[in-house]
Structure formats: structure tokens, C-alpha cells
């Protein structure tokens, strides 16, 4: 039986956005259970829409009285499908949206006490993540996620880049905003300068593969916001990203793969295999960044 222990707040800084704070509270949930629900949430969404694995788990904690040891995959999938609604956008295209948690538990037939429990469990699960690095007392990382995620929604509206991808790449490319390139130029995506760039530049060391080091010229920005805006513009103006299917992809796994396919990074392991998409996907899963996408796909 999986037991929830006392929820421990990971930060007390009142200036940090509540949503970001709630992403990183510590609850003792077995890693295997988290992976199980993450994978099922992605499977149900079928790379078209993002479900919340935490909402699925909270519902099952009510249905099975917190004993998740005998859960059947089919049972979870049946509930998960209730979150998905087929709609038509303004252009007449068929799309999938996600129903609100309260609507689904009502459809399931939970009584008032069960609804209360489901919401309590969901609140406790808000801070659970797959990562062993729970960000406890690491306020600089929390603030970095907050800063980038706030701007990522605007980037999504303009260029259809999922918030999870924007935040995940920013973390990966800038080492949580701590890289020399990031500190010296506000370039948090590692975008190099080319003939199309007329702005400021800076030279910095970089590593393309697992064991090499080179010096390259990168774009320099006056702010993080400018870096994020140019990141979206850079992807949009380079036809190879359109050809790779980046802008049509609606799931973090397919957008990550499209970035790799288009050559955003050519990083390889010692066996010569491209590994950028896998690294980015794992980072997003580890910190539950895919739940940022859940918000933009919810039915209003």
C-alpha cells in the first residue's frame, strides 16, 4: 500500500508564484507508481493532448482507498478517457481538449465526500515529481522555472511551442540559468549567431558531443524575455523546424523529437547516437513540466 506522508513545503518565499511553488512539495510516493501514471497519462493523450498523471492518481486513491497495488491499467485508461473531449477550432480543425478535474469526478459519480477526498489527494500530489532533486530550499531553480514559464505561455500563443518544451530547453541549455553564456548574454537557449542575426554577439565555449569542446559565436540579449522571444522567432523562421513537424506537434515527446530531427542540437553519446530528444523528454518528466501543457489545453 502506498502511504502519503506529511506534505512538506519546499519554500516559503511569498513572492514566488503559487503554481510554481506547488509543483515542488515533497510527498513520499514510490517512483514506480509515478512512472506508471506518467506513462498512462501520455498513452491516453495519444500525443495529441496532455493529461495530468496526478489527477488520474488522485482519482484512483479515492476509488481504491489509497491502495494502488492492485490497479489495472485498463481501469486507469477508462477513467483517463473521460478527460478528453473532441472539439472543432475556429479554422474548422478537429482538436482534443481536456476537461476540468471537477467535471470528470462528477461524471464518474463521486459523492460529496469522495469529491472532497479527491481534491485533498490532488492537493497533496501537486508537489510530487519523478526527480530525486525535489528542489528543496533551491530557490534559484524555483525562480528560474517561474520566470521562464510565465513567458512560455506567450511563446506558445505566438509560435505553438509547448510551455514544457520552452522551460525544459531553457533549463537544459542554460544549466538552470547558471551557464556562463546565460549569465553573460541572457542567451538561455544556446542559439548561435549567423548571417541572419544583426544584434550583439558573444563568444563562448560549447560542447557538441560527449567529449569535445569548441568556441562558437552566440547571440547576445538584453533580457531573458528577449531571449525567449527570439527563440520562438528563430524556430519559426527556420524552415527545417516546420519540415520536422515541430509546430504541428501537440505533445512534449513529439516536439522534443522534432527539435532533434531538425538539428537543434547534434549532441551524441559515445556510441554516436543522437540523444538530445531523450535528454529533454526525461528532464520534462523528472520535473513534471508537462503539466504546464495541461493548463493550455484545458476547456475554459
Where are the language model's segments positioned?
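Catalytic cores of secreted/periplasmic lytic hydrolases that degrade extracellular macromolecules
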Residues: 1-167, 171-172, 176-300
